[in-house]
Amino acid sequence: MIVVSNRKELDELIKQRISEQGFNCYLNDIDVSRVTDMSCLFKDSYFNGDISRWDVSNVKSMSFMFEDSMFDGDISSWNVSNVEFMRSMFRDSRFNSDISRWGTSN
């Protein structure tokens, strides 16, 4: 497991993986539990890999995270209960997966 402490480290690692393995690369071996900001992370991206096991329970902002992206993976099990900002998270993206069980009361 690769532990990242902040958004910058995560962004750099994702760019490296996509460069080496392509847009369907596996990212579930990255521990993102310390990251609090994922805004614009995959914005304008062709990424469509597996991030289903990410622990996003400490994330506060996911605004524009997948805007204009090709992502359509299964993220239904994400714990988004602490996310405060989801503005335009999936705006103009290909995302069409079921997230109806997300607890978004925050």
Predicted segments with their positions:
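Negatively charged
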Residues: 1-106
